[in-house]
Amino acid sequence: MKTDNTITLEEISLPNGKKLVCKEPLVLKIVEKGSLLVVKNSKLGIHCYEYTEKKLLNEIKEDLQILWEEYALGRIDDLSPKAIGLKEQLLTFFTEKN
């Protein structure tokens, strides 16, 4: 069963004290699969699932922190062609601010 619920992100706190700011609000559609709530965005490498919206939001934020550190801030020489594409998408959607 699908739901019309969405999660909207505008910024995420990073472990280094900086903020990951969305250039435009990122709206993610929540789909119900059994008792799980699922969010997927292939362009940004997001595929998260949890049992509550609060836990799902935390999971999305944690995933984006990892994706940002590993791919957006990663050296191009260390990334595969597919990972470079993800890096470019992340840099298109987000910026890091103090």
Whereabouts are the PLM-identified features?
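Short aromatic-glycine-(Arg/Gly/Cys) micro-motifs in beta-strand/loop hairpins
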Residues: 23-42
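A short, exposed loop/beta-hairpin motif centered on an aromatic-Gly-Thr core
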Residues: 42-54
